[in-house]
Amino acid sequence: MSKLWNFLLFQAGWFACVLGAAHQQVFWAVTGSLVYIAFHIWRAQSPKQEFSLLFKILLYGMATDTLIMYLGLLDFRDAWPSPLLSPIWMWALWLLVASTLNGSLSWLRGKPVLGAVLGAICGPLSYEAGVRMGAASWGPEGQILGLALIGLVWAVAMPLFLYWDQSPIEGALAKNL
């Protein structure tokens, strides 16, 4: 799959999940995202390795978003499947982000510092956009602390995800041209 299609499908999934959460109707957004993720894994150079990468990233995302929620920094509008965990639509977003590592974000390979900087900037911007679209709200601890922690989470996440990704660079880049 080309980098352009990977980027466009990520964006479509992001908007669908966030707007679905804002209106408490995430079923079709999550279903569509999961269908895309299944297709992405099926088309991967090494499906087993890609599945493992996506699963690790999903666990990281679930843990960090749940922690941010428990710290009172972020309240999700649609808490399904459980108010004790981050919501399923956020899980879909983490999987969508993971699908970009060997696609539209493959150019970040070997650039962990740039990955950290972009994560620290783009992560909080994405969450703020979701809040402004009505999918979540800042908790009683406030927006500034929430954005700072999300920036830290994503500054760690991007280099970590790139480290976890063991796909051969040449194969991943050639596949996406």
Segments (PLM) and residue ranges:
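Aromatic-rich, lipid-facing transmembrane alpha helices and their immediate juxtamembrane interface loops
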Residues: M1-L177
